[in-house]
Amino acid sequence: MQTWKKKLVVSQLALACTLAIASQANAKDISGTTYNTFGYDNTASTPWYYGYADWDYSDATHDGDIYPVINKSTVNGVISTYYLDDGVNGRANALSISNSTINGMITSECMTTTCAEGVDTDGTTHTQYDRFSLTVDNSTINDTYEHYAYDVVNGDTTETHYLDTYGLGNAITLDVESDIVIQNNSQIAGITLTQGYQELDNTPYDGVEGVANSSNIFTDTLVVKDSVLTSGAYSDLGTSGFYGQTAKPSDYGETNATAADDAALIVAASASDNAMQTTATFDHSTVTGDILFSSTFDNNFYENGDPATDTTEDGVYNPTTNGWDGTDKLDVTLTNGSKWVGAAQSSVEAIGTAQMYGQGYSNVDWHALSPNSIWPDSTFDSNGHVAGEEVYQSGLFNVALDNGSEWDTRKISNIDALTVNNQSQVNVENSGLLADSITLTNASTLNIGDSGAVATDSLYLDSYSRAALTEETAELYANTITVDNGAELALGLGQVDTHNMVLTDGGVLNVASRDYVLNSDLNNARYITNDSHKADYDYGVVALNSDGHLAVNGDVAGNYKVRIDDATGAGSVADYKNKEIIRVYDNNADTAASFTAANKADLGAYTYQAQQKGDTVVLQQEELTDYANMALSIPSANTNIWNLQQDTVGTRLTNSRHGLADNGGAWVSYFGGNFDADNGTVSYDQDVSGIMVGLDTQIDGNNAKWIVGGAAGFAKGDISDRTGQVDQDSQTAMIYASAKFMNDIFLDSSMSYTRFNNDLSATMSNGQYVDGNTTTDAVGFGMKLGYDWKPNLSGYVTPYAAISGLFQSGDDYQLSNDMRIDGQSYDSMRYELGVDAGYTFNYGGEQALTPYFKLAYVYDDADNNADINNDSIDNGVEGSAVRVGLGTQFSFTKNFSAYTDATYLGGGDVDQNWGANLGVKYTW
């Protein structure tokens, strides 16, 4: 049993002195009915009150009106729980409301003259024996009952009188120790919790025992699950309206609303002898309205020392003590996706360290009084100068968000500690937030928007959490900002002021595109070594875009990785190379900072990374970007396709001179190959496959036998390097001729027209996809002069010299990331000296097999440059190479044959890892 005694304070219920009780024989089960708590029958001068929740027992001084289990009911008026706590075993101090609507409120106050000022009908002081338990399940308590209107008949006149109830509180107003559960889609219009009972300290001070403190704590618990809590109303909302419509208690932010009218939860700890501590948990619920917390020092606490200890009346307090105080507390937790829109406002009393003498008294249980909080306005010494921040507060108000919950602040909020955990978020816009400390963990966010302001002694961002200032009018001030373990402070467009910026374990200061001056010290949490391979290595990250700049005015120490976040295809080398992005103004010889590159960024045609040069950090140029590399590789890769087509036609003409007689005919050939290219600037890997079909005939004339024909080629290529990719399509039309003279000298020649279509794609350093396409027209030629030396009728050895060239027109185009490619004309020449050797095996005159071998020296000459963003970049490939090949031709009949060969070419800027063609021909 709790021996709480009713405090001697004036009741807030003005109507308690006007209502009469309507006594009934027993408590009524009103479940399934509509019930009115007020009534009037014109026989009495005041209305009757039927609203007590009570147990039915015969020896009670009060007979109950409502059985304390209400289900599927509609109640109009005010329900009082005052008489539920009777101290009798078996009768719980509990009220359960389910599947019901209460058009009004629940209060723990006395509602009639029979118990005014906390004195029951038997003359004893009302006490709280047991904790009160309130369960609201799938129900609504809307605080809409503002008046009881009743008609009074006076002779021939009927007058309407009003009994005001709007000032009694909001939907749930309790001054007793309570455990409240609101669940299952319930809707409550405001909750007020006050401290109505206390257990007294042993007073007054007697010089021997002192004051024996009562260590009892007045506690309340509130759990709101899967439900809605809104603001209630303390004002008469019926005195104003808009087009005939008055405001509802649940309306938040109304023009005429008082602070109490906008409150969803009010917790008021009074100057009793005991502390009041409340926990409020919102689980998967919505709160719309302010949460107000007020606290004063306990009754026997003296800010400047207890005068009762001056037993000698000489003005000296002996011992010097503040007396007794228990810290009031309100802990609010939002969890599992709960959302709160409103302000958190705290009103407490505090003393500085100079006023802290101790608690308790000598020879009893004296102990020193110590600070329990800090004060934003600071503490001062006797000369009026700032002495510190530590204070002893009468109460503490803490807010925690967990598991994806959200708080959208309104007005001006001031609390002690704010913790934001597990992907939860706090949004401050057109409002302010003052907190002693703010901590974000596990990917949580603090967003400061338009006209939003946040001030704190310490802001701690941890484990990939993020604080961002999204508008120019956003402000953040903190004496110390710590960004830890991959978390990020994004300056955005707002203003950040601090004395000490700590970036540790990969914590990020994101400057973006700002030209920002940080007037603060910058350091790591632990600066021990610059060796990144050691376990105690610590570092922070400074993130910028290429057009951003950070200047630091303060002592700078520690290790920092500089990350370039943006990527673009626009801009020339002059726009980026050696551009300053960080400058440190630190004249302290005892501090040193190391800046290293965190990444490479695609800017224009090249990648860049950060490089420290003394007190500055600049952009250092590196290799080509993937998309620029692909764009510059396209002409060379086009040439590779064309060279394979030249080889395919060359094989057709070579085979016409060996094996069975060839008078011309129709042929078709598959060709393919794989290439690796690297000229020190561009590099790529290429796969090619295609088909050629041709038709030719033999003509005699001019002391030679001529084969003259035409061919069409179709090929697909795939170019790749890192994230770069090009899909190629080509179509070729070619005419060719081969003349074999009587002295076994031959001359092969060809002319061609080719159209190349290339679709380019890549991923930039920031993950952005980029693409583009280009179409190129090209003309080419080929000539091969050789001598067919036949040591016998079956064998041959053919030395030869060849020249070929492809001339591609320039196609100016732009990629999706704004990189411009101009002047892409590309000329390629190939010179070749080699020898072919083979032997023909005849089988019965109409079948023959001719295996052969190739060996050649090849020189490629493609000295070309391309303009990208007005910078000329070498994309030519050249160099000497060796070609080695093997092949065979088999004649099934004198008219039908098949052939195949494979070659390798390596040594120059482009290596052909393999090339092959497989064909068939039908001769006339």
Model-derived features: positions:
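Membrane-embedded beta-strand positions of outer-membrane beta-barrel proteins
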Residues: 384, 388, 666-670, 708-712, ...
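Outer membrane beta-barrel translocator domains of Type V secretion systems
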Residues: 623-793, 797, 903, 908, ...
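Extracellular beta-strand/loop-rich repeat segments of large surface/secreted proteins
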Residues: 270-273, 279, 288, 292-333, ...
